[in-house]
């Protein structure tokens, strides 16, 4: 080859690389690089966690007694418990533990660790205690209700009648009842905090991966546990990177710098649909986008004001223009797709009707208030749209943006006026899962601190509705139970609740086609232990 032709060849190669950024980079074959927004990643303590982001990390550091099959949610699979039985009276669950499990510290798993972990959730009384308190567990009765006849057996006696299937679903799906290495955590406890401060940035699990490092709003790295009881994971390492800008995530996926990206703006997701190297996984979740009102605020304690706001939201417009890829129109507290879910009531923007309601409530000229929202999409755009239609009715809402702790923290403290948010659990395949999170409020006192219940956060309380929810949960006749759930939704609607469902969440995850056996979980408990990657000629091994 002469010099001219050689030069042309080099130039052509350079041009090819320049025009094909995906050829410039490839992640290592044995590592998974995940891009995500970590603004809501506030703690790694399973008892304190809130939000989908942390759940997806915690379930790969710890194990629970059981888990849900991501492709058939009603299928409960064994985990630390190799088998279990439910008593004839539906009031007792007995779990038999595996005998080959060790924690990352080398300590051997025993029933004492399971019991201590469950006691810890209740005694700390943080976010994840709410569900178990609603089932009747308390710091006073937990020692009698959860016992260990021997080192390999755990017996859970239900304090009050319940559907044992729901309890199993909760143990499997919530992530709150993962089992901690009690000896390791107790050694790190300070001032009777049950190790909470230490576990904020550390872990004490038996899961497929160990925590290497977490630098808040920067990077979190986990490495495989070669001695994991199910067998060593196929990936040596998983790296989660904090990338807040959607365009950055898109560019890095195009270049091959990331294997998986979540929290992307839908326009960027759509732009990647035709990339032959990428796949878009869309998973519908039970989580609901909503507008919440605080009934601690005199304005929103008035049902006529709450009803006025019901008609100052352009549900159809928001879902059509802002929620494509994020969610679908839904106006009921029970997630769609269940036999117990009523059709939507069909609420629409109706400014004249809203103005009349406000005038009747004593606010003919409206009033000033605040609207809290995460500084992320789609939340911010939804809040701006709602601010605009509220203004048409005379309600002047100042938008306050912030991080998850600033926004949801104020809601957990019941120190807010209006809030655009997302919640509703729905992770368990049972109508009670949605109702418990969005509607149920067994104790409206500030001291109750039922912070994982949106009903408590908003100050919405109705004793009859609580009783109806309790009764429906225990109904054994399937047809009657469905009718009970219909009646609950009708009463909830008539009460003009403090939380208005707008859209049901769809989670879009962009995945490089080199990634194999990655199955996004509707409950956010996505397991990474079996994930692997096809080799790439430009990818190296672990460094």
Regions found by a protein language model. Give the residues of each.
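Alpha-helical secondary-structure segments
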Residues: 33, 110-117, 151-157, 161, ...
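N-terminal lobe/hinge region of extracytoplasmic solute-binding protein
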Residues: 35-88, 119, 202-208
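A structural "hinge/loop" feature
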Residues: 39-55, 77-80, 107, 129, ...
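Detector for C-terminal structural segments
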Residues: 53, 215, 312-340, 377-387, ...
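Gly/Pro-rich hinge or "lid" segments in bacterial periplasmic/extracellular proteins
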Residues: 70-71, 173-232, 237, 351-352, ...
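Aromatic- and charge-enriched surface segment that lines or borders ligand/interaction sites
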Residues: 82-128, 155-157, 165-166, 249-252, ...
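Surface-exposed binding/hinge segments that line
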Residues: 96, 134-187
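Ligand-site clamp/hinge motif
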Residues: 197, 225-271, 388, 396-398
């Amino acid at each position: 080859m002469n010099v001219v032709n050689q030069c042309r060849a080099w130039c052509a190669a350079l041009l090819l690389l320049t025009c094909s950024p995906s050829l410039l980079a490839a992640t290592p074959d044995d590592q998974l690089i995940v891009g995500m927004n970590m603004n809501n990643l506030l703690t790694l303590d399973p008892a304190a966690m809130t939000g989908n982001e942390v759940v997806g990390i915690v379930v790969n550091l710890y194990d629970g007694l059981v888990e849900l099959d991501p492709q058939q949610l009603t299928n409960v699979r064994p985990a630390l418990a190799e088998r279990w039985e439910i008593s004839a009276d539906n009031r007792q669950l007995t779990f038999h533990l595996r005998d080959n499990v060790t924690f990352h510290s080398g300590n051997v798993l025993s029933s004492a660790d399971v019991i201590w972990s469950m006691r810890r959730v209740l005694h700390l009384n943080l976010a994840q205690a709410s569900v178990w308190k609603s089932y009747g567990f308390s710091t006073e009765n937990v020692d009698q209700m959860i016992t260990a006849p021997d080192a390999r057996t755990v017996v859970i006696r239900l304090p009050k009648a319940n559907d044992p299937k729901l309890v199993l679903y909760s143990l499997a799906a919530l992530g709150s009842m993962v089992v901690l290495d009690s000896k390791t955590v107790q050694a790190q406890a300070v001032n009777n905090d049950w190790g909470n401060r230490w576990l904020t940035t550390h872990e004490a699990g038996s899961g497929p991966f160990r925590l290497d490092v977490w630098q808040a709003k920067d990077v979190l790295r986990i490495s495989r546990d070669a001695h994991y009881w199910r067998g060593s994971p196929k990936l040596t390492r998983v790296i989660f990177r904090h990338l807040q800008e959607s365009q950055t995530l898109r560019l890095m996926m195009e270049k091959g710098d990331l294997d998986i990206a979540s929290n992307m703006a839908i326009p960027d997701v759509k732009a990647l649909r035709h990339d032959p190297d990428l796949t878009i996984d869309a998973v519908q979740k039970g989580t609901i986008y909503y507008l919440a009102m605080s009934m601690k605020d005199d304005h929103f304690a008035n049902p006529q004001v709450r009803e006025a706001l019901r008609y100052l939201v352009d549900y159809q417009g928001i879902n059509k223009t802002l929620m494509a890829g994020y969610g679908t129109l839904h106006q009921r507290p029970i997630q769609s797709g269940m036999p117990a879910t009523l059709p939507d009531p069909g609420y629409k923007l109706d400014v004249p009707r809203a103005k009349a309601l406000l005038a009747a409530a004593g606010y003919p000229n409206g009033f000033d208030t605040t609207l809290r929202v995460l500084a992320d999409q789609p939340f911010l755009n939804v809040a701006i749209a709602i601010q605009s239609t509220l203004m048409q009715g005379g309600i002047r809402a100042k938008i306050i943006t912030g991080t998850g702790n600033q926004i949801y923290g104020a809601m957990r403290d019941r120190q807010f006026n209006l809030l655009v948010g997302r919640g509703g659990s729905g992770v368990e395949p049972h109508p009670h899962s949605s109702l418990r999170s969005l509607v149920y409020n067994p104790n409206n006192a500030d001291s109750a601190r039922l912070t994982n219940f949106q009903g408590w956060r908003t100050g919405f309380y109705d004793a009859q509705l609580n009783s109806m929810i309790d009764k429906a949960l225990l109904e054994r006749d399937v047809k009657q139970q469905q009718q009970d759930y219909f009646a609950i939704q009708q009463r909830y609607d008539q009460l003009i609740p403090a939380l208005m469902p707008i859209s049901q969440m769809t989670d879009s995850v962009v995945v490089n086609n080199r990634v194999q056996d990655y199955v996004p979980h509707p409950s956010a408990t996505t397991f990474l232990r079996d994930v692997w990657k096809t080799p790439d000629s430009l990818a190296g091994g672990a460094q």
